[in-house]
Every structure is written in structure tokens, then in C-alpha cells.
A protein has these predicted regions:
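Class I S-adenosyl-L-methionine-dependent methyltransferase catalytic core
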Residues: 1-167
């Protein structure tokens, strides 16, 4: 879809690679759902992708899809996305994908805080949310808005580490 294509164009520009590739990148999709974002990163050359999902039925689907696609760079873990991010080595991820359930607003702040710790200084955090997150809200979490796109009811954010003045 258009949002996903835009996201991966944004990420490829950060990676400095033509053709939309993410070679050597380490990524985590903390609320994987169908795995679309993480699997797309793997298809674009990411070295490792961790898909984290709580619902066992979705985890089963992800495992089948990983096998079908022979996605060797992909690991799948059943669990809480925030907890997985908190366990991730600091500054180790080039891309952190956050698409928490829109009906769970309490997940956003802890997810963003954990993502800011996990993401590499040259990396990015992608957030899908039902509303725009501005720099005033993001700054205490250690992030700033780098790119934004609104598509229907979805606000797609690409966030970077540090204050907005570092953009």
C-alpha cells in the first residue's frame, strides 16, 4: 500500500542505498500482527528482523509465512512488544516498527520510550497512530518527528532520536 511504500522510501533514504534496500539493518516489529512491515524489511535485505506478537493465532500464521517465504533473517517471538523492546540491546536497532492497537492508547508512551532506547542513533522509529504525535510530546521520550503522512484515519510517523533541532 501507499503508506508502506512511502515508509520504505524514507528508510532507504536514511540507509543511503538506492532501490529501497536496507542491507545490514537490524529491525524489530514490536506489534507485528500480520508481519507486513518486518517481512518487507527482510525482503529489502535487512540482516535481522524480530517479529513480536502476543496473539498465538497470529504467531502461528507468521511462522507459516516465514517458512513459505524462506525468510531466514526473520525471527518470531510470542510476547509483549514493549517488553521485547525493553530487552533489546540499547542503540542496536536500525528500524523499530510500532503499530500498536489503536484501541490501546496506554501502549504508545511506553512503546515510544523503549523504542527510543533500542534504536541506533542513525536509525528510525516508525509509528502508526490514530493521531499526530508532535515534537512537544515526543521530546520527553527522546524522539522527534522526522517525517509524517496522513492516510485516511492513520498517521504514519518516522521518528528520529534526539531533539527536533537535530533534524
Amino acid at each position: 500500500d501507499r503508506v508502506r511504500e512511502t515508509l520504505f522510501n524514507w528508510l532507504a533514504s536514511l540507509a543511503g542505498v538506492g532501490g529501497g534496500g536496507l542491507p545490514g539493518w537490524h529491525c524489530i516489529d514490536a506489534f507485528a500482527g500480520t508481519g507486513a512491515l518486518g517481512l518487507e524489511a527482510a525482503s529489502r535485505g535487512a540482516a535481522s528482523v524480530l517479529l513480536v506478537e502476543q496473539e498465538s493465532a497470529l504467531v502461528d500464521q507468521l511462522l507459516k509465512l516465514k517458512t513459505k517465504l524462506a525468510a531466514e533473517a526473520v525471527r518470531i517471538e510470542r510476547g509483549n512488544g514493549v517488553t521485547a523492546l525493553e530487552r533489546t540491546t540499547a542503540n542496536s536497532m536500525h528500524a523499530v516498527f510500532l503499530d500498536p492497537p489503536f484501541e490501546s492508547p496506554a501502549l504508545y508512551e511506553p512503546s515510544l520510550r523503549a523504542a527510543a532506547r533500542a534504536v541506533h542513533d542513525d536509525g528510525a522509529v516508525y509509528l502508526e497512530a490514530p493521531r499526530l504525535w508532535n515534537d512537544e510530546e515526543l521530546a520527553p521520550l527522546g524522539l522527534h518527528l522526522y517525517r509524517h503522512l496522513k492516510a485516511g484515519a492513520v498517521h504514519a510517523h518516522l521518528l528520529r532520536k534526539g531533539p527536533a533541532s537535530a533534524a
